[in-house]
Amino acid sequence: MTIQREQLEADVLIVGAGPAGLSCALHLANLIKRHNASGAKPELSAENIYVLEKGREIGAHQLSGAIMNPSALAELVPDFAKTAPLDTPVTDSAALIFTQKSSYRIPITPPPFNNAGNYVISLSKLVKWMGGLVESAGVNLFKEFGGAELIYSGDGIAGVITEDKGLDKNGKPKDNFTPGYELRAKVTVLAEGTRGSLTKQLVAKNKLDNINPQSYGIGIKELWEVPPGKIQPGFVAHTLGWPVSSKMYGGGWIYGLQNNRVSLGLVIALEYEDPRFDPHVAFQTWKTHPFVRNLLDGGQLVRYGAKSLPYGGWYAMPRNYVDGGLIVGDSGSFLDSQRLKGVHLAMKSGMLAAETIFEALKKEDYSAKTLQAYKENIDHSYIKTELWKVRNFHQSFRNGMLDGFFHSGLQQITGGRGLIDPMRAHAGHEAYGKIYGRPAPERFKGDGKLTFDRLTDVYHSGTRHDEDQPCHLKVRDLDICATRCVEEYGNPCQYFCPAAVYEMAKEGDTLKLKINAANCVHCKTCDIADPYQIIDWVVPEGGGGPNYEGM
């Protein structure tokens, strides 16, 4: 059917209201305000900046550990300490080695684990606060709207079409059907987070990939409330070892928050060999370690969530400018994979994008030639300084932790070069080995007090979708799922998804993939880790998804 869409025009359209997108909007609004106050021409307006947020509230889809380096926030909001919801400054940084029964604190905390001067934060709270500043600056911020489709103009982009609302699960209009808007803009900023669906399309269409494919990890997090005295606010610990195999890359975190709350989780690189490895089970198992068990004893689970993150670093960063478009934040691989710090880099990338757009608006030139200044600004900023030092870091661990420590140690004393520069990488899903008829493991149930099954955790994520809408997890060939994938890999989607979205259900004598899309926490692991790369995550109806309040 042909859909008539309302068309709106903006100077700047930002897709995604995370730290990168909101920093871009706020910094650009401030630049415009100073420009207009000076009497310079042309006169510009912050009201012509549009920001789309697919969540039902600003911050609802924001999840991180999180420890934040405040450098970018201090640039953006110099008096941030007066009003920003920063939970607590870091007071103690520990690096712990776990064996199954014991733990050992490294006497001198390695520099990557030293967080002096940083803050433990709730990213959701911080982003919600930033959203208020953006709206106060006159920017138009639209909640419950996702970018469903790019509007192309030659090799560039000219805006996006938002998702249609009110379609039933068969794609037929319901009584409340509302077509998506056609939003056209002089510059469109993709700030969708890791594995953004529009960014993925643009990178593929315009061949914007770098020399390495992007590498990804999945972070699984729980927020707990524990009895008083169990942990000091500002205590942060990172764990290495059990239960993560030395052949894999990953580790845990424990962060002390105010009001007897604890942020804890496990991060695993999505490039392991066993297709039936289960990151959620690994996290639940990690919690049974005596150190963690003792911390959580007498406490209760408050919130749960999961998110993918870009590990690839400098050599996996896509070209981040095209005619009429820029890529910022996690969509553009702005993450220090050694320190697992990305909030300040995302914010800085958004600010540099704002400065580039501001100059383009003044010149009324939105070509790639003009927007290329964004990349040049990055190269002359502390983003390049930080990421260049760790440009080969994650690739060092492709053959396991011991090999990784050897290479990363050499990189530490050679400014990031090491023995091989650039060190190449392979896409994570290519690491899977075949199952060769091995039986499936028993499914994890949890004890309901310390450890939990997926559905219990999903309940604590606040996830909500209208079940009568088209499935937003598009599998291009279901026959592969019921045949080749069963035999070759044992359907890894049942294991890598932290939200029980995918299951193989029996229908007579055959297996068929069942997709429980309403459980989806928007981590996009399926889009990343599927061995055949036939799953496409697209935006569901706006307002759906998790509610990461306080996370």
Tell where the protein language model's regions lie, with residue ranges.
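Iron-sulfur cluster-binding cysteine motifs and their immediate structural context
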Residues: 487-514, 525-547
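Glycine-rich phosphate/pyrophosphate-binding beta-alpha loops
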Residues: 120, 331-344
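Predominantly flavin-linked oxidoreductase catalytic cores and closely associated redox partners
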Residues: 43-45, 133-294, 333, 352, ...
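N-terminal FAD cofactor-binding segment of flavoenzymes
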Residues: 27, 31, 45-100
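N-terminal Rossmann-like FAD-binding beta1-loop-alpha1 element of flavoenzymes
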Residues: 10-50
